[in-house]
C-alpha cells in the first residue's frame, strides 16, 4: 500500500473536529473540559483543538507525573500550557501508586503501568466532578485498534476527538496545528518507566502498523491480498490477533438483552428527550 493513502487534508480535519468538540460538550449541558496533558503529541493535539473549540478559559490541563516520569515530559507539557495560556494543575500520582503496591512488591511493569493509568483517571474524573466539566480523551485509532492502552485508565473519557485518527495522522495534524517541534520529533512514549517507548513495547513502528491497519480496516483487504503487498505473514497475524483479542476494550460492557428497550442496544437517543430552550 502506498503511504499517501494515510494522508488527510488536515485543514478539513481541523474544521470537523473543532465543532465536533464544541457540539458534543455543549449538547450534554457542559461548557468546559479537563484532560491529561502528558507532554506527548496526542494530548497536545487534543488540547490545541479543545482551546480552538471552547476557548482558553474552558480548558483545564492536568499534569499527573509519577516519580519515574521524565523531566522532558513535564517540560513539554508546560510548553503547551505556555503556548496556549490555559489553566493547569499538577497532581502527582506517586503516593497513590506506591501505596497500592506497598503490599504487592512483585507486581509486573504491566500491572504498575495499568495502576498508574487508572490513578490518573481517578484524578481526571474527580476534577470533572469538582468543576462540572467533561473529560476529553486522547487515545488515537492505532492504540484503540491494538488495545495499546488501559481500560478505564487512559482509554476512559466522555468524548474522544482523535479516536478515528491513526498515529501517523496525528503527526500530520500536529504539524498542521503548529504543535511545537520537540513534541513531534521525540519518540512516542507513555512514560510509564525510564526509557520506555511505544514502538519498543509493540515491536514495530507506528508507520508499519498504520499501513497494515489501513489495509485491514479502510481497504477491507483479506489476508492473501495483504500478503501480496509485501506484508510479512507473522506481522500480519500478530496485528490481527491484537485487534481481535482487544475488541472488548473498544466496547461498553455488554448487556444481556431481556426487555424491549435496552441501554446501548435499542435505547440510544436520550438527547431527544431534552427540552429545547
From Swiss-Prot:
Residues annotated as binding Mg(2+): 42, 143
Pathway: Cofactor biosynthesis; NAD(+) biosynthesis; NAD(+) from deamido-NAD(+) (ammonia route): step 1/1
Catalytic activity: deamido-NAD(+) + NH4(+) + ATP = AMP + diphosphate + NAD(+) + H(+)
InterPro entries: NAD/GMP_synthase, NAD_synthase, NH(3)-dep_NAD(+)_synth, Rossmann-like_a/b/a_fold
GO CC annotation terms, alphabetical: cytoplasm
Top enzyme category: ligase
Gene Ontology MF: a single term: NAD+ synthase activity
Chain positions recorded as ATP binding sites: 36-43, 138, 167, 189
EC numbers on record: 6.3.1.5
Pfam families hit by this protein: NAD_synthase (PF02540)
Domain of life: Bacteria
Disulfide bonds: none
The keyword Membrane appears for this protein: no
GO BP annotation list: NAD biosynthetic process
PANTHER family linked: GLUTAMINE-DEPENDENT NAD(+) SYNTHETASE, NH 3 /GLUTAMINE-DEPENDENT NAD + SYNTHETASE
Family to which the UniProt record says this protein belongs: Belongs to the NAD synthetase family.
Oligomer status and interactors: Homodimer.
Function noted in UniProt: Catalyzes the ATP-dependent amidation of deamido-NAD to form NAD. Uses ammonia as a nitrogen source.
Protein known as: NH(3)-dependent NAD(+) synthetase
Organism: Chlorobaculum tepidum (strain ATCC 49652 / DSM 12025 / NBRC 103806 / TLS) (Chlorobium tepidum)
Name of encoding gene: nadE
Amino acid at each position: 500500500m502506498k503511504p499517501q493513502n494515510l494522508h488527510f487534508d488536515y485543514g478539513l480535519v481541523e474544521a470537523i473536529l473543532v465543532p465536533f468538540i464544541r457540539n458534543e460538550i455543549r449538547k450534554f449541558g457542559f461548557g468546559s473540559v479537563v484532560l491529561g496533558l502528558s507532554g506527548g503529541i496526542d494530548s497536545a493535539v487534543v488540547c490545541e483543538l479543545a482551546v480552538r473549540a471552547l476557548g482558553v478559559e474552558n480548558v483545564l490541563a492536568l499534569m499527573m507525573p509519577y516519580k519515574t516520569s521524565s523531566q522532558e515530559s513535564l517540560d513539554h507539557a508546560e510548553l503547551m500550557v505556555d503556548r496556549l495560556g490555559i489553566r493547569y494543575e499538577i497532581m502527582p500520582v506517586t503516593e497513590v501508586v506506591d501505596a497500592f503496591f506497598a503490599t504487592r512488591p512483585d507486581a509486573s511493569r504491566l500491572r504498575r503501568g495499568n495502576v498508574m493509568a487508572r490513578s490518573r483517571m481517578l484524578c481526571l474524573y474527580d476534577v470533572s466532578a469538582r468543576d462540572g466539566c467533561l473529560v476529553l480523551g486522547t487515545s488515537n485509532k492505532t492504540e484503540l485498534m491494538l488495545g495499546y492502552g488501559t481500560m478505564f485508565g487512559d482509554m476512559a473519557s466522555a468524548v474522544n476527538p482523535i479516536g478515528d485518527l491513526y498515529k501517523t495522522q496525528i503527526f500530520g495534524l500536529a504539524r498542521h496545528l503548529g504543535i511545537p517541534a520537540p513534541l513531534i520529533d521525540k519518540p512516542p512514549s507513555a512514560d510509564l518507566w525510564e526509557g520506555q517507548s511505544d514502538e519498543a513495547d509493540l515491536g514495530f513502528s507506528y508507520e508499519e502498523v498504520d499501513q497494515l491497519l489501513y489495509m485491514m480496516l479502510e481497504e477491507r483487504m483479506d489476508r492473501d491480498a495483504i500478503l501480496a503487498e509485501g506484508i510479512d505473514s507473522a506481522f500480519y497475524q500478530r496485528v490481527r490477533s491484537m485487534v481481535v483479542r482487544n475488541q472488548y476494550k473498544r466496547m461498553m460492557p455488554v448487556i444481556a438483552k431481556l426487555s424491549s428497550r435496552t441501554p446501548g442496544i435499542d435505547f440510544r437517543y436520550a438527547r431527544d428527550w431534552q427540552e429545547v430552550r
